[in-house]
């Protein structure tokens, strides 16, 4: 049983000092990494530094939040202590690798001790903390939570257990709410007026939909969002007029065809080719050949956003890639094969997965598939720019994935606290035991910290900034979701392993978060660590 105790007094000034200390230590590690050959040479060091830097930035984003009230300050101090513990754990025994002295974080140990006390964490078990959203975003949250609760949640378990399809009522309902037009500029039939509002609205909506179901909720708006960003950044005016209104209304649903069997996160070296040619009617365009994999929602989608090599010179790597909008018929979720009059063929094989079910993922073999020339994003001026257009969409995709992770965490926490308050063991509800309370407290703290960091990144991206932070929030929050969902399952005991409890679905769904939208290792080594080294050299 937990022993009642008074909480330590939150000290945000001291918390900021602790964050600054951790930041300086990580900075020394980055400079050492740069001096010794960089991320490709010292991958373990680079990975640890990337995750440490992401944890530090998560903590830094909480300082303003902590100043808004007592519970907010307690959550902030608890997370800063948790961050310090994570960085210390990665550093311990590797001080020489980092290029730092022994115990470089020792001056902050008193803070870590005070705010990692089991009694203190236990006191936070039911302190989720307010979100502090502006009125317009409160409305977004209420609207999407209501829809998710009434329409998505009732289908979540059936779709997961039977690997069923996304019900059409969910797609049509989201379309009526304008979910697919949140990032489409208003002049093209969407709701975006620019600024941080569109990123925040998307982030909040995605969390609420994912809280009900990752597979048939939060992920539905990600793929149209990625194509929308690519069109806004690189499309011709005619292409924007043609496609953006259809994406906003869900008349057109999109899937992303980038990854290949031998080229997962190594996008720059993919091999699918698009060669200029004509169809049987003499229309000019491109003929595509290659194999794409992990194309989620490809059967139900009307178009594929497909990245292909238009320059046969492989030495040009990412500079030889172009981005296409590839129309296709609707297909059967269990597999599909389409033929064009001129002989083109597209065949999709479903990939069975342990979780994240409903949208279904496919390996797609494409043979002599014709697309008109005006389906190349940017048309002639878009040749060789596909990688950049795609990445502009993926950056926001990483933020959305973090928001999806927050939704899964929130659902996991709610499931755990409800079960703990009703399950008795040894004569008491398990929620009364200190170990359970401490777990719930840490879950609440990490979930709110992850949410606030995602809000911070959304605001940065609304200003045209935050590309690095988008990768960091994805790296930190998705790993955190694995821990939160695991502990939620553990609190359920044996019932957590039973399909009749939703926490088992949340656990397997959470596992995909650090794999898709940029595998964690690739994100840390090729994006975060590399950028940290570049920034260090520029100082």
Question: What are the roles of these predicted feature ranges?
Answer:
Residues 1-17, 27, 132-133, 196, ...:
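FAD-binding core of flavoproteins
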Residues 2-211, 222, 234, 239, ...:
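Alpha-helical interface subdomain recognition
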Residues 217-238, 264:
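N-terminal glycine-rich flavin-associated loop
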